[in-house]
């Protein structure tokens, strides 16, 4: 099993690939937004994506002050880690190997938002290691992921959502989420609904892990991941 995470404070997402000798390869797409519109949640339910709203208001630094803000984020980070680790535990059977991959922070990132992200992600990964759920952990730079997706370099900087577009062209061929993205069924007015970018990035994290680690880790072949990237 490979679980690729696009980890964020507001709307973390995961693409879990399970390789079974008898059942073949299966994909789970799941996200845990702080909050999401009912119309968006309904669209996800219609294309095989599990979307669990945490029903949280944003933490207000002004209203709570620095100390209370830090404590609020730590409590939320711990609660989120418990939710995600509980879900991973429910998907992992005895004898399964679980590899967890995530995207690293971009070079030059700074500010409170990045500090909070590092806190949430650190609490999550520490929890994985503490309970021994993951057999190995991997982290990849944003540039590495973009290279795997075929959209690295200056030529793609002007494009609005290259990782989403690449997913629509190259995502798992039998999954309804791929079809929904390819046919632009998850757009509200002129923009993608919340979490589409996170779910697509999570897929590219998973695919990056497979490509980079398959020789060393002995992953079973995943046909969709072996295909040439359509550009």
What residues fall within each predicted segment?
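Phosphate- and other anionic-substrate recognition elements at nucleic-acid/protein interfaces
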Residues: 1-231
